[in-house]
Amino acid sequence: MPDKAEVFFDEGVLDFADVDEIVLDVGEEALAEALAHRHRRMIVFQGDEGKAEAAGVVTAGAADVLFDVRDRPISVLYVTDSLKEDTYARERYEEFRRVLEGFAEEANFEYELEALTFSGSKRALGTTWDLMVIDLSYDLDPDAIGRLVETVRGGGLVIFQTPPFDRWRNMWTAFHKSLVTPPYTLDHVGKRFNRRFIRKLKEHDGVWIVDTDEWTAEPEPSEDVDLEVEVKRRERPDLDPPDDAVLPEELYRMCATEDQFRALIRFEELLESNGKTALILTADRGRGKSALLGIAVAGAGVTTDVYDVVVTASEPENVAVLFEFLLEALRELGVEYDVERDDKGNIVYVETDDFVVEYERPSEASEIECDLMVVDEAASIHVPILERILDNNDKVVYSSTIHGYEGAGRGFSVRFLQNVRKRRDVRLIEFKMHEPIRYDSDDPIERWLFDTLLLDAEPADLDKEDLECVKEMRVEFEKPDLRYWFEDPEGEEELRQFIGIYVMAHYRNRPSDVMVLADAPHHEAYALKTETGKIVTALQVAREGTIPRDVITKMRRGYRPPGNVIPDLMVQHHDALDFPRMKGLRIVRIATHPDIMRHGLGSRALKELAKIAKKKDYDWIGTGFGANEELTRFWLRNGFVPVHISPNRNPVSGEYSVAVIRPISEEAEEIINRANFEFRIKLADWLGETHRDLEPEVARLLFEPMSSLRYRPTLTEGQLRRLKKYADMVHTYEIAADAVRELAKAYFLDTEDRPELSEEEELLLITKCLQRWKWADVADVLGEEVPDLMRSLRDLVGLLYEEYKEDLQRSAAVEGIRKAVERLADKGLTGTVIVEVEEGEPKEVIIRREERLEL
């Protein structure tokens, strides 16, 4: 391949398109810079006419040059909102393809063209392209842009087609239309994200903007640009493996950068270590972490005694690159293998004669013991799962993206690594990869991408004065002006502080979250700021409710109005048809600066939000969260009432989702308290079925009474006799378990005059009686011996029996009467029923004038 290139676009390409020569000038200059620095460059064609042909001209001219430079077919990816026939998007694609195909045939260069829609953009993950064209004429999908732009290699071009900027600033995209929720219309949707996106295109180096209606360019092409350039190429590391290397030399030669080479050495340290060891690999996107892991896993399986390897990530698609390089490494080593794929075509299982590699979802992986556990994109997995994985395995690799659309690696570092570093039983090996694989460092298009999508947003740096403000609670609760944040360059710093807190928090962040905040008509932001002006707590809330009656009628039949999570839940699970017409706020996200957690700032923010809600005549504030003990305690402490728990654990977080609501109005309070009581009744039953694995501490908190309600236990005469005999040490627990369970339910559902039990006693009732755990499992959780727990439970039952004795006898009496009447009715007898009761129990039932039946 030549070391020099003459970046001249053959003017013959203009025969296939009606565009101005300025398109050639811009294309040549952009490609020359890209090749000289092994960076990417971007060209934006904005206008109504000619942009598809202009994109075709630059792509064709660049592909002609690159075919000589690369000495292989040039890969081109075209992405748009739709490829359906008879759409404007398809029409633009065909115009683009006509230019590219026509000139390729004339100039005799080879290329490979693939077209995707934004909805299918995940297919581009792990791929690499020489040239990319993204049609933004109708839609602006931030998540897709985050995935796609990074896949273009150094020396290549990213080309955007957009509407005229003047119109685009005020235009609704397809994404915007998805933000419309009742009672709002499209007219209520903002365009702040569009305007910031345009501003960022103008601010950054390496970006040319061509107006295809006026045929002008900004910046203008330089007249003295040198189009004969030295082509900068990626140099593989000229390094020798360690003399005592465990992994084969062939695998070290596969490393594309020195960082990958060094990371492989650190992986060997993990393999040779004794005891519990964790290797932490962190990097920005596109640094080759996943590829390196695939190479490393192949080496571990072939050359060590590692047999079973488990790979986990939030989705199977996230480990596609890992499996791709695993197979490539096996081929390099001459190892035969078999592959299994899921129904979407993702590799999920690889087997060789020496070892197996299997993909598992995070919640399932956290319960597995294996020789080697690999966690890819750990940032998107909740910390409790990451910790359980380490608890169960001696050799674990955690790979995490620092800046990226899947999650926040720095949040992973802050929360997870802080905990791991405190553990004396874990050896920690850390390595950060800096060198990009596809392009060289300091790439201007990467800087544009990170800035535009706020992938590198960080919380404010807090100095001594800021910390003093927090300590003394000298903070103000503010509702920021989103227009100022997104449209005024001076608002950029506060926006970055706000989003940066979420990046550090437990939320999985995507670029589309920023667009929702910017433009969704029902979303708004609140911030807790120090007197010094630093944002320390960030809240994003969604206005819900005030749903029209005709929509509520549809909801009864299963219709789920978009953007109304809490009202929908209350109708579907509690048949609360008055609730959707009420006005509420759903907390979408709340997070506090990681340096000042547990200072009461989150609670202060919720208190201030409740004041605003009351002042503005809202009826309720609600939210949903992954239920662990700490978060559940936080929400309940702040006056939120649980009304629902999901039937299944989230496959990524491994937690059940709980919905809680804080009533503001009296009308809402009545509905919410009733829903809470019904929820607790259902939870008492679910704990023995769908939620047997719910953390007992969480269950205990969810049972906390939120209002004064009376629950009367119900037992038959037979159950009551067995319960007595169990309390009197005649029966074992198993004989009376059904009756004891009803007694435990009575304790957790009753809120009037119930006895005070300790936390340990309540956990015993939950685990043994409601969740029906084995005695050994209860003992493991409570840290007690089984015989001691047996005695404690019998004593508890005796105490509760005395407390609910009258209710239990009354229920047995009623049950006895019902059965007696049924027996008489079966005989066809009629008359007046007379019940004689002694000490709360029925002694006989009389049918006056006809027959007497002894009980």
Swiss-Prot record:
Keyword Membrane appears in the UniProt entry: no
Binding site for acetyl-CoA: I590, A591, T592, M597, R598, H599, G600, L601, G602, S603, E630, R637
UniProt-annotated binding residues for ATP: Q260, G286, R287, G288, K289, S290, A291, L292, L293, G294, I295, R438
Gene Ontology terms: biological process: rRNA acetylation involved in maturation of SSU-rRNA; tRNA acetylation; tRNA wobble cytosine modification
A GO molecular-function descriptor: tRNA N4-acetyltransferase activity
EC number: 2.3.1.193
Reactions catalysed: cytidine(34) in elongator tRNA(Met) + acetyl-CoA + ATP + H2O = N(4)-acetylcytidine(34) in elongator tRNA(Met) + ADP + phosphate + CoA + H(+)
Pfam families named among the record's database cross-references: GNAT_acetyltr_2, NAT10_TcmA_helicase, TmcA_N
Residue intervals of the N-acetyltransferase domain: 480-663
Localization of this protein: Cytoplasm
Coarse class of the protein's main subcellular location: cytoplasm
Protein name per the record: tRNA(Met) cytidine acetyltransferase TmcA
Top-level taxonomy: Archaea, Methanobacteriati, Methanobacteriota, Methanomada group, Methanopyri
